[in-house]
Amino acid sequence: MNVVIVGAGVAGVNAATKLVDNNFKGKITIIDMGLDPYNRPTSDVMRGFLGAGGWSDGKLTYHTSIGGQLSKYCGEDKAMELFDQVIDNFKRFHPNPSEVQCSDPQAEPDFIKPHFGLRLFPVWHVGTDYLHEIGKNWYDYLVDKGVEFVWETKVHAIDFENCRVLGKSLVGDIHTEDRYDKLIFGVGKSGIDFGKQLAEEYNLPTEPKSVQIGVRFEAPQQHFQKLIDISYDFKLYQKFEDKGVSLRTFCTNNNAAYVAAEHTYGDVSYNG
């Protein structure tokens, strides 16, 4: 049996890991527009092994109360079980698992109650520099298990009738064709246009996501230290029912050391 996975982000990599951990005997091929963790440039923050998370600061915020709609399709308990498996894999390939930190707030502190709510769930931090080593260890494990990677290749069509994935190299005039018995579609942000193309071509049902507008706010860390001591990546929120909108904080970057440039559709933005 041939399994083809489109996308080497967290979804695709964990899918391949699940297969090999369960002694899958067929062929596994992962196709991605980026590169492996040894050769992926820091400028490519979206594509390559582990996807957008590969060049992040190493925070893991997997919970049904924030982002995503996985629980809608498989239920709350199953979603949390899958999230735990992902977190376990990041710890499993960590070169020094004892260094993994977790902040798990148990109650909202009184000093914010008049103003905001605080999401109560654990946030794991594997370490910014360690994250690169995790990626290498994880990649080596999959390669040792026989997983094949096709890098710098953009999938431009999927022939469902004949079970073919059609791609083209981004570095040369090379066209690829991979036949599959099972297909896992795991593209992320950099493949969203292709996902939309497939949905329109095959009349797949879709639903719009809510619009989120982000504002970067910087302030001295001491202003937030009491919150940071409770939750490293604190998630404050407030709903304005009369206006039909809500406000939340996300991806706090305490005592930041790195800033990465992100190139999307010709625009350049940055992350702390």
Region spans (language model):
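Residues forming the flavin
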Residues: M1-T64, D104-G272
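Rossmann-like flavin
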Residues: I66-G67, S71-V126
